[in-house]
Amino acid sequence: MRHRAPHLLPVLLCLLISSAGCAFPRIVVLRDPLTSEEHLNLGVTYEKQGEYENALKEYKRAAKDLPVAYLYMGNVHFQRGKLDEAEKLYKRSIEKDRANADAYNNLAWLYYVKGENLDEAEAFALRAIELNPSKNHIYQDTLEKIREKK
């Protein structure tokens, strides 16, 4: 019996080590299965349901490829009364996409609501009208309200 034990121990050790890897399977996600557009749409759904933190997480994921996601994040912060954060995000949206008329309009509206930077707000509203004349009625409303407040 004593002579068999030294030979049996290495065999048992090999079996134990090789079976340990099989006993605990690991799931490794190499990349995000959702596209940026899907993250944006999921964020919109969360936002509509009032789940703002989840919406922000999804917009943040979408922002890697879609600059418009910064606009959406700004809108969430605006709705929650976090105007300084909304302002930063609207500016970031404009920085990333200078042709985003909605970002200019929303920043103009934010300044209107805060009652500050009204000259700049007017310029932003005019820029929105220039960039997207098809939404002139929306942007014109912003512009008129700003001019009334000045």
Indicate where each model-derived feature is located.
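Canonical tetratricopeptide repeat
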Residues: N41, Y72, N106, D141-T142
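Structural marker of alpha-solenoid helical repeat scaffolds
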Residues: R31, A62-D65, K96, E130-L131
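Structural motif corresponding to the intra-repeat A-B loop/turn of tetratricopeptide repeats
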Residues: Q49, R80, K114-G115, K150
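Position-specific recognition of the canonical hydrophobic site in helix A of tetratricopeptide repeat
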Residues: L40, E47, F78, Y112-V113
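Helix-start (N-cap) detector for alpha-helical repeat units in TPR-like alpha-solenoids
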Residues: S36, P67-L71, A101-D102, N136-H137
